[in-house]
Swiss-Prot record:
Protein name: Cytochrome c oxidase polypeptide 4
Translocase among keywords: yes
Biological role stated in the UniProt entry: Part of cytochrome c oxidase, its function is unknown.
Complexes and interactors: Associates with subunits I, II and III to form cytochrome c oxidase.
Upper taxonomic lineage: Bacteria, Bacillati, Actinomycetota, Actinomycetes, Mycobacteriales
Species per Swiss-Prot/TrEMBL record: Corynebacterium efficiens (strain DSM 44549 / YS-314 / AJ 12310 / JCM 11189 / NBRC 100395)
GO cellular component terms listed in the entry, alphabetical order: plasma membrane
Name of the gene this protein is made from: ctaF
Length: 143
């Protein structure tokens, strides 16, 4: 078993213990010390979080058995072993900031339920995504 699945299994055990403590704590104790019913939102969240970390741990465990030794699990690995090939990055591009503004505009439209603002935000987001992807030009046709 490798480190990633061990972390998920440990988190599963922790969340299961916290779910049991939380369920019994909210079932029997109130802020005033009187008997109270189960608090369903927190109990459901903890139980589902436990199930999610267990599913993720099992998936990682099965996946790691099929792969070779990862750099994280190899004691003599260097930092460069994990890095891989980095893609092109344009530090002077304005479009990531413009795209963030468009997402903010869309978010405000959704929050305040102004349909015109949702439309403007969606159009601005579509425009900025296109400009980000095509900022270095579209190659000319070869014919």
């Amino acid at each position: 078993m490798k480190s990633s699945s061990k972390i998920m299994y440990g988190l599963t055990v922790f969340l299961a213990a916290m779910a049991v403590i939380y369920i019994f704590g909210t079932m029997y104790v109130d802020d005033r010390g009187s008997v109270m019913g189960l608090e369903w939102v927190g109990a459901t969240a903890l139980v589902l979080s436990t199930a999610l970390t267990l599913m993720l741990g099992v998936y990682i465990h099965i996946t790691e058995r099929r792969t070779d030794v990862l750099p994280e699990d190899w004691e003599e690995a260097e930092v460069a072993d994990k890095a891989g090939t980095l893609g092109f990055f344009s530090p002077g591009s304005i479009w990531p900031a413009a795209m963030s503004g468009a997402v903010g505009l869309l978010g405000f439209g959704i929050i305040f339920m102004h349909y015109w603002l949702i439309l403007v935000g969606a159009l601005a987001l579509t425009y900025t995504i296109a400009k980000l992807n095509f900022q270095y030009g579209v190659p000319r046709e070869k014919h």
